[in-house]
Amino acid sequence: MSEHSPEASSTYAQVTSNDELSSNKIYMNADQNNSRKKEMDGSLQNNGGRLQNVNPLGGNESMSAVATSAASSLPTAENGVSLNAASPTIHSNTPTVVSHPVMSGSELKGEESHNSPGTLNGTSVANASKQPNMPNATFRCDKCDMMFVKQSGLTNHKRTYHQVETVVIIGHRRYVWRRNENGRFQCVCGRQNWRRPVNFASHAKQCPSFLAMDPNNIPPEINKVSPHDDLRPLSDSRRRARRPHPSDTIPPGASMARSDPSQVPESNPSAAAAVAAAAVAAAANLTNGVNPPEVPRNLNSSLVDAAESLANVSQQQHHRHPFARQPDYSAHSIPRTAAPYAPSMNMFAQNGPNTSLLPTAMPSDVSISSSLQQQPIHPSYDSRFSKAPQGTDALAALGYGTPSSAATLCPLYRDTPAAIVSEKLHLRLANLRIAYCEDCREFISLNAALDHRRSHHQQNITGDLVHVYSDFLDFQNC
Protein backbone atom coordinates (compact mmCIF):
# COMPACT_ATOMS: atom_id res chain seq x y z
CA MET A 1 0.00 0.00 0.00
CA SER A 2 1.46 3.26 -1.03
CA GLU A 3 1.32 6.40 1.01
CA HIS A 4 -0.81 8.17 -1.54
CA SER A 5 -3.44 5.50 -1.91
CA PRO A 6 -6.99 6.40 -0.89
CA GLU A 7 -7.15 3.65 1.75
CA ALA A 8 -3.99 4.88 3.43
CA SER A 9 -5.19 8.44 3.47
CA SER A 10 -8.54 7.46 4.99
CA THR A 11 -6.81 5.32 7.60
CA TYR A 12 -4.49 8.17 8.49
CA ALA A 13 -7.40 10.56 8.79
CA GLN A 14 -9.26 8.14 11.04
CA VAL A 15 -6.25 7.63 13.32
CA THR A 16 -5.68 11.34 13.44
CA SER A 17 -9.29 12.00 14.42
CA ASN A 18 -9.15 9.30 17.09
CA ASP A 19 -5.94 10.79 18.48
CA GLU A 20 -7.48 14.26 18.58
CA LEU A 21 -10.51 12.99 20.47
CA SER A 22 -8.38 11.15 22.98
CA SER A 23 -6.11 14.15 23.42
CA ASN A 24 -9.12 16.40 24.06
CA LYS A 25 -10.32 14.04 26.77
CA ILE A 26 -6.87 13.93 28.32
CA TYR A 27 -6.63 17.73 28.27
CA MET A 28 -10.01 18.00 30.00
CA ASN A 29 -9.01 15.52 32.68
CA ALA A 30 -5.69 17.30 33.20
CA ASP A 31 -7.45 20.65 33.61
CA GLN A 32 -9.76 19.18 36.25
CA ASN A 33 -6.82 17.73 38.14
CA ASN A 34 -4.96 21.04 38.02
CA SER A 35 -7.99 22.97 39.33
CA ARG A 36 -8.39 20.52 42.22
CA LYS A 37 -4.72 20.77 43.04
CA LYS A 38 -4.84 24.57 43.06
CA GLU A 39 -7.90 24.52 45.30
CA MET A 40 -6.17 22.27 47.83
CA ASP A 41 -2.98 24.35 47.74
CA GLY A 42 -4.94 27.57 48.31
CA SER A 43 -6.83 26.11 51.25
CA LEU A 44 -3.55 24.99 52.78
CA GLN A 45 -2.08 28.46 52.43
CA ASN A 46 -5.14 30.12 53.96
CA ASN A 47 -5.23 27.78 56.94
CA GLY A 48 -1.48 27.76 57.50
CA GLY A 49 -1.19 24.05 56.80
CA ARG A 50 -2.77 23.18 60.17
CA LEU A 51 -5.72 21.26 58.78
CA GLN A 52 -5.12 17.52 58.55
CA ASN A 53 -6.66 15.06 56.15
CA VAL A 54 -7.62 11.61 57.23
CA ASN A 55 -6.00 8.95 55.08
CA PRO A 56 -8.48 6.18 54.34
CA LEU A 57 -5.65 3.63 54.65
CA GLY A 58 -4.88 4.80 58.20
CA GLY A 59 -2.79 7.56 59.76
CA ASN A 60 -2.77 11.32 59.28
CA GLU A 61 -0.92 13.15 56.61
CA SER A 62 -0.75 16.78 55.75
CA MET A 63 -2.54 18.38 52.86
CA SER A 64 0.74 18.92 51.08
CA ALA A 65 1.36 15.18 51.14
CA VAL A 66 -2.15 14.59 49.86
CA ALA A 67 -1.58 17.01 47.03
CA THR A 68 1.77 15.36 46.16
CA SER A 69 0.31 11.89 46.22
CA ALA A 70 -2.65 13.03 44.17
CA ALA A 71 -0.35 14.52 41.59
CA SER A 72 1.95 11.46 41.51
CA SER A 73 -0.88 8.96 41.32
CA LEU A 74 -2.25 10.25 38.08
CA PRO A 75 -2.47 7.39 35.56
CA THR A 76 -0.10 7.29 32.65
CA ALA A 77 -0.81 6.68 29.05
CA GLU A 78 0.04 3.55 27.22
CA ASN A 79 3.15 5.10 25.82
CA GLY A 80 4.50 5.74 29.37
CA VAL A 81 4.03 9.50 29.43
CA SER A 82 2.88 10.87 32.82
CA LEU A 83 -0.34 12.86 32.90
CA ASN A 84 1.02 16.08 34.34
CA ALA A 85 -0.13 19.59 33.66
CA ALA A 86 3.22 20.31 32.07
CA SER A 87 2.91 17.72 29.32
CA PRO A 88 1.41 19.51 26.33
CA THR A 89 0.62 16.48 24.16
CA ILE A 90 -0.75 13.27 25.65
CA HIS A 91 -2.28 10.75 23.30
CA SER A 92 -4.44 8.43 25.39
CA ASN A 93 -8.10 7.88 26.00
CA THR A 94 -7.70 6.39 29.51
CA PRO A 95 -9.98 8.07 32.11
CA THR A 96 -8.45 9.93 35.02
CA VAL A 97 -9.16 8.80 38.61
CA VAL A 98 -8.00 10.47 41.84
CA SER A 99 -7.09 7.95 44.50
CA HIS A 100 -7.51 10.20 47.57
CA PRO A 101 -10.71 12.03 48.52
CA VAL A 102 -10.74 15.80 48.44
CA MET A 103 -12.13 17.83 51.37
CA SER A 104 -15.18 19.90 50.62
CA GLY A 105 -15.24 23.64 50.99
CA SER A 106 -17.49 23.52 54.03
CA GLU A 107 -15.05 21.21 55.85
CA LEU A 108 -12.11 23.46 55.00
CA LYS A 109 -13.88 26.56 56.29
CA GLY A 110 -14.85 24.88 59.54
CA GLU A 111 -18.59 24.94 58.86
CA GLU A 112 -21.04 22.62 60.49
CA SER A 113 -21.43 19.18 58.93
CA HIS A 114 -23.90 16.42 59.65
CA ASN A 115 -21.48 14.32 61.68
CA SER A 116 -19.73 17.15 63.62
CA PRO A 117 -21.21 18.85 66.69
CA GLY A 118 -23.05 22.13 66.13
CA THR A 119 -20.78 25.15 65.93
CA LEU A 120 -21.31 28.75 64.91
CA ASN A 121 -18.18 30.65 63.87
CA GLY A 122 -16.01 28.72 66.25
CA THR A 123 -18.52 29.01 69.13
CA SER A 124 -20.52 26.07 70.36
CA VAL A 125 -24.28 26.12 70.45
CA ALA A 126 -24.31 25.98 74.24
CA ASN A 127 -22.23 29.16 74.48
CA ALA A 128 -24.36 30.92 71.88
CA SER A 129 -27.48 30.40 73.97
CA LYS A 130 -25.88 32.36 76.84
CA GLN A 131 -25.71 35.55 74.74
CA PRO A 132 -29.31 36.80 74.11
CA ASN A 133 -30.08 39.51 71.59
CA MET A 134 -31.69 41.91 74.13
CA PRO A 135 -30.71 42.44 77.79
CA ASN A 136 -33.11 41.39 80.48
CA ALA A 137 -35.19 44.17 82.14
CA THR A 138 -34.81 43.63 85.86
CA PHE A 139 -36.12 46.90 87.39
CA ARG A 140 -39.89 47.11 87.76
CA CYS A 141 -41.91 50.12 88.87
CA ASP A 142 -44.19 49.27 91.79
CA LYS A 143 -46.72 51.92 90.71
CA CYS A 144 -47.39 51.14 87.06
CA ASP A 145 -45.49 47.82 86.51
CA MET A 146 -43.19 49.28 83.86
CA MET A 147 -39.87 47.54 83.24
CA PHE A 148 -36.54 49.35 83.05
CA VAL A 149 -33.08 48.12 82.16
CA LYS A 150 -31.17 50.46 84.50
CA GLN A 151 -31.80 51.73 87.98
CA SER A 152 -31.37 55.32 86.77
CA GLY A 153 -34.24 54.87 84.33
CA LEU A 154 -36.52 53.69 87.10
CA THR A 155 -35.46 56.61 89.31
CA ASN A 156 -36.17 59.18 86.61
CA HIS A 157 -39.52 57.56 85.91
CA LYS A 158 -40.59 57.75 89.55
CA ARG A 159 -39.38 61.34 89.87
CA THR A 160 -41.33 62.36 86.78
CA TYR A 161 -44.61 60.50 87.18
CA HIS A 162 -44.87 59.25 90.77
CA GLN A 163 -43.19 61.98 92.83
CA VAL A 164 -45.49 62.97 95.67
CA GLU A 165 -44.57 66.65 95.75
CA THR A 166 -42.42 69.17 93.96
CA VAL A 167 -40.77 72.43 94.91
CA VAL A 168 -41.36 75.57 92.85
CA ILE A 169 -38.82 78.32 93.53
CA ILE A 170 -39.75 81.83 92.38
CA GLY A 171 -37.25 84.43 93.49
CA HIS A 172 -36.92 84.17 97.26
CA ARG A 173 -40.19 82.31 97.60
CA ARG A 174 -40.37 78.55 97.78
CA TYR A 175 -43.59 76.63 97.22
CA VAL A 176 -43.99 72.97 98.17
CA TRP A 177 -46.77 71.61 95.97
CA ARG A 178 -48.33 68.17 96.10
CA ARG A 179 -50.26 66.00 93.68
CA ASN A 180 -54.02 65.66 93.90
CA GLU A 181 -56.05 62.47 94.19
CA ASN A 182 -55.63 61.81 90.47
CA GLY A 183 -51.85 61.93 90.71
CA ARG A 184 -51.52 65.31 88.97
CA PHE A 185 -50.28 68.74 89.96
CA GLN A 186 -53.34 71.02 90.02
CA CYS A 187 -52.86 74.79 89.92
CA VAL A 188 -55.02 77.17 91.95
CA CYS A 189 -56.32 78.73 88.76
CA GLY A 190 -58.13 75.48 88.01
CA ARG A 191 -57.34 75.57 84.31
CA GLN A 192 -55.05 72.62 83.78
CA ASN A 193 -53.20 69.87 85.59
CA TRP A 194 -49.88 68.26 84.85
CA ARG A 195 -48.24 64.92 85.51
CA ARG A 196 -44.68 66.15 85.09
CA PRO A 197 -43.36 68.54 87.76
CA VAL A 198 -41.31 70.55 85.26
CA ASN A 199 -44.42 71.40 83.23
CA PHE A 200 -46.29 72.48 86.33
CA ALA A 201 -43.40 74.66 87.48
CA SER A 202 -43.26 76.39 84.09
CA HIS A 203 -46.94 77.27 84.37
CA ALA A 204 -46.74 78.31 88.03
CA LYS A 205 -44.01 80.87 87.36
CA GLN A 206 -46.35 82.70 84.97
CA CYS A 207 -49.72 82.17 86.65
CA PRO A 208 -50.98 85.26 88.55
CA SER A 209 -53.16 83.16 90.83
CA PHE A 210 -50.23 81.04 91.89
CA LEU A 211 -47.90 84.01 92.33
CA ALA A 212 -50.44 85.79 94.53
CA MET A 213 -50.34 83.04 97.13
CA ASP A 214 -48.22 83.17 100.25
CA PRO A 215 -45.79 80.21 100.40
CA ASN A 216 -46.34 79.89 104.15
CA ASN A 217 -50.14 79.95 103.96
CA ILE A 218 -51.11 77.54 101.21
CA PRO A 219 -54.76 76.48 101.67
CA PRO A 220 -54.99 72.79 102.62
CA GLU A 221 -58.01 72.31 100.35
CA ILE A 222 -55.85 73.03 97.32
CA ASN A 223 -52.59 71.41 98.33
CA LYS A 224 -53.60 68.52 100.50
CA VAL A 225 -52.05 65.11 101.00
CA SER A 226 -53.35 62.27 98.88
CA PRO A 227 -54.54 59.29 100.99
CA HIS A 228 -52.01 56.83 99.51
CA ASP A 229 -48.62 58.47 99.89
CA ASP A 230 -45.94 55.86 100.58
CA LEU A 231 -42.98 57.79 99.19
CA ARG A 232 -40.80 59.99 101.34
CA PRO A 233 -41.61 63.67 100.75
CA LEU A 234 -39.15 65.47 98.57
CA SER A 235 -39.09 68.58 100.72
CA ASP A 236 -37.57 66.80 103.72
CA SER A 237 -34.40 65.80 101.90
CA ARG A 238 -33.99 69.12 100.13
CA ARG A 239 -34.50 71.26 103.22
CA ARG A 240 -31.57 69.60 104.94
CA ALA A 241 -29.24 70.32 102.05
CA ARG A 242 -30.07 74.00 101.48
CA ARG A 243 -29.54 77.10 103.57
CA PRO A 244 -32.61 78.08 105.60
CA HIS A 245 -34.45 81.22 104.57
CA PRO A 246 -36.82 83.32 106.71
CA SER A 247 -39.58 82.85 104.15
CA ASP A 248 -39.30 79.07 104.42
CA THR A 249 -40.46 78.94 108.01
CA ILE A 250 -43.75 77.06 108.27
CA PRO A 251 -45.77 76.91 111.48
CA PRO A 252 -45.74 73.46 113.09
CA GLY A 253 -49.50 73.23 112.98
CA ALA A 254 -49.63 73.91 109.25
CA SER A 255 -46.93 71.36 108.50
CA MET A 256 -48.69 68.73 110.60
CA ALA A 257 -51.94 69.49 108.86
CA ARG A 258 -50.35 68.86 105.50
CA SER A 259 -48.39 65.77 106.56
CA ASP A 260 -51.12 63.88 108.44
CA PRO A 261 -53.74 62.42 106.09
CA SER A 262 -56.16 61.74 108.94
CA GLN A 263 -56.51 65.43 109.77
CA VAL A 264 -57.36 66.49 106.23
CA PRO A 265 -61.10 66.77 105.49
CA GLU A 266 -62.70 65.11 102.55
CA SER A 267 -62.53 66.73 99.15
CA ASN A 268 -65.20 69.39 98.67
CA PRO A 269 -65.58 70.71 95.11
CA SER A 270 -67.36 73.87 96.23
CA ALA A 271 -64.66 74.70 98.78
CA ALA A 272 -61.93 74.12 96.21
CA ALA A 273 -63.72 76.36 93.73
CA ALA A 274 -64.14 79.08 96.36
CA VAL A 275 -60.47 78.98 97.27
CA ALA A 276 -59.48 79.09 93.61
CA ALA A 277 -61.72 82.11 93.06
CA ALA A 278 -60.21 83.78 96.12
CA ALA A 279 -56.72 83.21 94.73
CA VAL A 280 -57.76 84.79 91.42
CA ALA A 281 -59.15 87.77 93.31
CA ALA A 282 -55.91 88.07 95.25
CA ALA A 283 -53.98 88.22 91.99
CA ALA A 284 -56.35 90.91 90.71
CA ASN A 285 -56.01 92.99 93.86
CA LEU A 286 -52.25 92.79 93.96
CA THR A 287 -51.91 94.34 90.53
CA ASN A 288 -53.67 97.51 91.62
CA GLY A 289 -50.84 99.09 93.59
CA VAL A 290 -48.17 101.33 92.14
CA ASN A 291 -44.67 100.07 92.64
CA PRO A 292 -42.51 103.11 93.62
CA PRO A 293 -38.94 103.41 92.37
CA GLU A 294 -37.46 102.51 95.75
CA VAL A 295 -39.42 100.27 98.09
CA PRO A 296 -37.84 99.35 101.46
CA ARG A 297 -37.30 95.59 101.48
CA ASN A 298 -37.48 95.07 105.23
CA LEU A 299 -40.17 92.40 104.87
CA ASN A 300 -39.87 88.81 103.72
CA SER A 301 -39.17 89.92 100.14
CA SER A 302 -42.82 89.24 99.37
CA LEU A 303 -44.62 91.38 96.85
CA VAL A 304 -47.87 90.61 98.60
CA ASP A 305 -46.85 92.21 101.88
CA ALA A 306 -45.10 95.10 100.16
CA ALA A 307 -48.17 96.01 98.11
CA GLU A 308 -50.55 95.80 101.05
CA SER A 309 -48.21 97.74 103.34
CA LEU A 310 -47.94 100.49 100.75
CA ALA A 311 -51.72 100.61 100.58
CA ASN A 312 -52.02 100.87 104.35
CA VAL A 313 -49.55 103.74 104.53
CA SER A 314 -51.32 105.60 101.74
CA GLN A 315 -54.63 105.30 103.58
CA GLN A 316 -53.13 106.37 106.92
CA GLN A 317 -51.63 109.48 105.35
CA HIS A 318 -54.67 110.24 103.25
CA HIS A 319 -55.11 113.70 104.77
CA ARG A 320 -51.49 114.73 104.08
CA HIS A 321 -51.35 113.61 100.47
CA PRO A 322 -51.81 116.68 98.25
CA PHE A 323 -53.32 114.59 95.47
CA ALA A 324 -55.41 112.31 97.65
CA ARG A 325 -58.84 111.63 96.21
CA GLN A 326 -61.78 112.93 98.26
CA PRO A 327 -64.74 110.67 99.04
CA ASP A 328 -67.14 112.89 97.09
CA TYR A 329 -64.86 113.13 94.10
CA SER A 330 -67.30 111.52 91.69
CA ALA A 331 -70.04 114.07 92.49
CA HIS A 332 -68.01 117.24 91.85
CA SER A 333 -66.33 118.61 88.80
CA ILE A 334 -62.65 119.38 88.97
CA PRO A 335 -61.22 122.52 87.37
CA ARG A 336 -58.63 121.77 84.72
CA THR A 337 -55.85 124.25 85.25
CA ALA A 338 -52.19 124.23 84.43
CA ALA A 339 -51.15 125.20 87.95
CA PRO A 340 -50.65 121.68 89.26
CA TYR A 341 -48.19 120.94 86.46
CA ALA A 342 -45.31 123.07 87.68
CA PRO A 343 -41.90 121.38 87.58
CA SER A 344 -41.82 121.42 91.38
CA MET A 345 -44.89 119.23 91.48
CA ASN A 346 -43.23 116.42 89.60
CA MET A 347 -43.68 113.27 91.65
CA PHE A 348 -40.70 111.66 90.00
CA ALA A 349 -38.31 114.11 91.61
CA GLN A 350 -36.37 113.11 94.67
CA ASN A 351 -38.32 115.50 96.93
CA GLY A 352 -41.64 115.24 95.15
CA PRO A 353 -45.04 115.47 96.82
CA ASN A 354 -45.56 111.72 96.84
CA THR A 355 -42.42 110.93 98.80
CA SER A 356 -44.51 110.94 101.95
CA LEU A 357 -45.91 107.61 100.82
CA LEU A 358 -42.64 105.88 101.70
CA PRO A 359 -42.13 105.77 105.47
CA THR A 360 -39.04 104.51 107.23
CA ALA A 361 -40.76 101.35 108.41
CA MET A 362 -43.79 99.46 107.21
CA PRO A 363 -46.02 97.20 109.27
CA SER A 364 -45.17 93.54 108.77
CA ASP A 365 -48.32 92.01 110.26
CA VAL A 366 -50.34 92.30 107.09
CA SER A 367 -52.04 89.16 105.90
CA ILE A 368 -53.53 88.40 102.55
CA SER A 369 -56.61 86.96 104.19
CA SER A 370 -57.97 90.41 105.09
CA SER A 371 -57.91 91.60 101.51
CA LEU A 372 -59.53 88.38 100.35
CA GLN A 373 -62.44 88.88 102.74
CA GLN A 374 -63.01 92.59 102.11
CA GLN A 375 -62.46 92.82 98.39
CA PRO A 376 -65.09 91.72 95.88
CA ILE A 377 -64.21 88.59 93.92
CA HIS A 378 -63.94 89.37 90.25
CA PRO A 379 -64.37 86.37 87.95
CA SER A 380 -62.09 87.83 85.30
CA TYR A 381 -59.44 90.46 84.97
CA ASP A 382 -61.45 92.60 82.55
CA SER A 383 -64.44 92.86 84.86
CA ARG A 384 -62.46 95.18 87.16
CA PHE A 385 -62.62 97.83 84.46
CA SER A 386 -66.41 97.97 84.40
CA LYS A 387 -68.47 100.50 86.34
CA ALA A 388 -69.29 99.58 89.89
CA PRO A 389 -72.84 99.83 91.33
CA GLN A 390 -74.23 102.50 93.72
CA GLY A 391 -72.92 105.43 91.71
CA THR A 392 -69.24 104.70 92.23
CA ASP A 393 -66.75 104.86 89.42
CA ALA A 394 -64.26 102.33 88.19
CA LEU A 395 -61.62 103.54 90.67
CA ALA A 396 -63.77 102.29 93.51
CA ALA A 397 -64.14 98.98 91.74
CA LEU A 398 -60.37 98.82 91.57
CA GLY A 399 -60.12 99.12 95.33
CA TYR A 400 -59.48 102.82 95.91
CA GLY A 401 -61.39 103.99 98.96
CA THR A 402 -61.71 100.50 100.48
CA PRO A 403 -60.52 99.68 104.02
CA SER A 404 -56.91 100.30 104.85
CA SER A 405 -55.81 96.66 104.76
CA ALA A 406 -56.53 96.23 101.05
CA ALA A 407 -54.13 96.80 98.19
CA THR A 408 -55.18 100.05 96.52
CA LEU A 409 -54.35 102.02 93.42
CA CYS A 410 -52.34 105.15 94.19
CA PRO A 411 -53.17 107.98 91.74
CA LEU A 412 -50.26 109.86 90.25
CA TYR A 413 -52.13 113.05 89.30
CA ARG A 414 -55.69 113.63 90.31
CA ASP A 415 -56.76 116.42 87.95
CA THR A 416 -54.62 116.07 84.87
CA PRO A 417 -56.37 116.84 81.56
CA ALA A 418 -55.56 113.33 80.37
CA ALA A 419 -56.55 111.86 83.75
CA ILE A 420 -53.75 109.34 83.64
CA VAL A 421 -54.24 107.02 86.58
CA SER A 422 -52.02 104.10 85.76
CA GLU A 423 -50.70 101.02 87.44
CA LYS A 424 -47.49 99.09 87.17
CA LEU A 425 -47.86 95.38 87.59
CA HIS A 426 -45.91 94.07 90.56
CA LEU A 427 -45.43 90.66 89.08
CA ARG A 428 -44.53 91.91 85.57
CA LEU A 429 -46.91 89.53 83.88
CA ALA A 430 -47.59 91.29 80.61
CA ASN A 431 -46.20 94.82 80.97
CA LEU A 432 -49.80 96.05 81.09
CA ARG A 433 -50.33 99.82 80.89
CA ILE A 434 -53.78 101.24 81.61
CA ALA A 435 -55.03 104.82 81.63
CA TYR A 436 -58.30 106.04 83.17
CA CYS A 437 -60.42 108.79 81.64
CA GLU A 438 -62.52 110.61 84.25
CA ASP A 439 -64.98 111.97 81.70
CA CYS A 440 -65.70 108.65 80.01
CA ARG A 441 -65.33 106.63 83.21
CA GLU A 442 -63.46 103.91 81.35
CA PHE A 443 -60.01 102.47 81.01
CA ILE A 444 -58.03 102.83 77.82
CA SER A 445 -54.54 102.05 76.67
CA LEU A 446 -51.88 104.28 78.12
CA ASN A 447 -50.27 104.86 74.74
CA ALA A 448 -53.60 106.11 73.39
CA ALA A 449 -54.46 108.32 76.37
CA LEU A 450 -53.32 111.61 74.83
CA ASP A 451 -54.98 110.90 71.50
CA HIS A 452 -58.16 109.94 73.32
CA ARG A 453 -58.38 113.28 75.14
CA ARG A 454 -57.68 115.18 71.95
CA SER A 455 -60.18 113.34 69.75
CA HIS A 456 -63.05 112.61 72.13
CA HIS A 457 -62.94 115.61 74.44
CA GLN A 458 -61.31 118.26 72.20
CA GLN A 459 -58.76 119.28 74.77
CA ASN A 460 -55.45 120.76 73.84
CA ILE A 461 -52.34 118.99 75.03
CA THR A 462 -50.11 121.41 76.87
CA GLY A 463 -46.38 121.13 77.18
CA ASP A 464 -46.62 120.42 80.88
CA LEU A 465 -48.82 117.46 80.23
CA VAL A 466 -46.43 116.09 77.62
CA HIS A 467 -43.63 116.49 80.15
CA VAL A 468 -45.58 114.61 82.80
CA TYR A 469 -46.55 111.93 80.31
CA SER A 470 -42.97 111.39 79.19
CA ASP A 471 -41.79 111.23 82.79
CA PHE A 472 -44.40 108.64 83.52
CA LEU A 473 -43.29 106.52 80.58
CA ASP A 474 -39.71 106.72 81.82
CA PHE A 475 -40.91 105.58 85.22
CA GLN A 476 -42.76 102.66 83.68
CA ASN A 477 -39.72 101.58 81.68
CA CYS A 478 -37.29 101.71 84.58
From Swiss-Prot:
Q: Which InterPro entries match?
A: Znf_C2H2_type (IPR013087)
Zn finger limits (C2H2-type): 139-162
| Gene Ontology CC annotation, any one | nucleus
Where it sits in the cell: the answer is:
Nucleus
Q: Which GO terms describe its biological process?
A: regulation of transcription by RNA polymerase II
The entry lists its GO molecular-function terms as: DNA-binding transcription activator activity, RNA polymerase II-specific; RNA polymerase II cis-regulatory region sequence-specific DNA binding; zinc ion binding
Would I find Transcription regulation among this entry's keywords? yes
Q: For the region Disordered, what residue ranges are annotated? A: 1-71, 104-135, 218-270, 311-336
| Keyword set, alphabetical order | Activator, DNA-binding, Metal-binding, Nucleus, Transcription, Transcription regulation, Zinc, Zinc-finger
Q: Where is the composition biased (Low complexity)?
A: 62-71
Per UniProt, the ranges with Polar residues bias are 7-33, 43-55, 115-135, 260-270
Q: Where is the composition biased (Basic and acidic residues)?
A: 226-238
Q: What is its main location?
A: nucleus
Record's function text = Acts as a DNA damage-response activator of rhp51. Binds to part of the DNA damage-responsive element (DRE), (5'-NG[GT]T[GA]-3').
> Can you say what this protein is called?
Transcriptional activator protein rdp1
